[in-house]
């Protein structure tokens, strides 16, 4: 795959925040300076448990926008695209039955959130996008390019951030083709114990865990191969 910028979680957060700030910037007339179709989704590549979701939530909080997180491995073709149903249409005086799709669960959730909170802008964070099933992979690629699931587009004011695990942590990882990398702004996050420790203190990770990791620093980086892939 295409290599991005390698950085620790703190630097990654800054990078994401700067990009998000640019994407949310409006001109004097209240239009986004960078239109939705020009915004390349960020793709955060980093090991599980490094705090990807947490930094997205922090960035959203600091920018005063909403955030909606999904792990794409929990989604099926139906929940991403919407469910098919039969609609009746009239063409030239004759009635026909055609398939329509209900709204994508993910897109519907954005509208629900805007309705419930009154927040009009937000970050849609889709994790584990490189571990999706074969049937979801083409849908995901189309989404990354056009920001649509089925017939429904991500509403204006919502910015897409994606993340994935490196192949050594998950044997169901798909390699994106080079075309896909051109659509994404890739950020590679490296485990960095000292930065993680500072971050962990702030977020309240138990002191015993920190002490243990301080003594056994190797455990912080170690990946043990288990039967069903890497943990």
Explain the meaning of each model-derived region.
Residues 4-67, 72-124, 129-231:
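C-terminal regulatory/interaction module of P-loop NTP-utilizing enzymes
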């Amino acid at each position: 795959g295409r290599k991005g910028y390698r950085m620790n979680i703190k630097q990654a957060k800054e990078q994401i925040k700067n990009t998000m700030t640019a994407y949310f910037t409006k001109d004097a007339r209240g239009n986004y300076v960078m239109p939705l179709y020009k915004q390349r989704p960020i793709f955060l590549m980093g090991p599980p448990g490094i705090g990807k979701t947490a930094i997205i939530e922090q960035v959203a909080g600091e920018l005063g926008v909403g955030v909606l997180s999904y792990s794409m491995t929990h989604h099926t073709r139906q929940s991403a695209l919407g469910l098919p149903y039969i609609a009746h249409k009239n063409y030239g005086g004759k009635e026909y039955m055609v398939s329509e799709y209900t709204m994508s669960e993910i897109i519907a959730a954005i509208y629900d959130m805007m309705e419930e909170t009154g927040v009009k802008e937000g970050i849609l964070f889709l994790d584990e996008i490189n571990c999706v099933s074969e049937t979801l992979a083409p849908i995901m690629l189309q989404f990354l390019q056009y920001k649509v699931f089925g017939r429904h587009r991500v509403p204006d004011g919502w910015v897409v951030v994606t993340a994935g695990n490196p192949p050594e942590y998950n044997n169901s990882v798909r390699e994106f083709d080079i075309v896909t990398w051109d659509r994404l702004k890739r950020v590679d996050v490296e485990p960095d114990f000292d930065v993680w420790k500072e971050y962990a203190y702030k977020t309240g990770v138990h002191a015993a865990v920190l002490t243990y990791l301080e003594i056994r620093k190797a455990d912080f980086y170690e990946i043990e191969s288990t039967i069903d892939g890497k943990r």
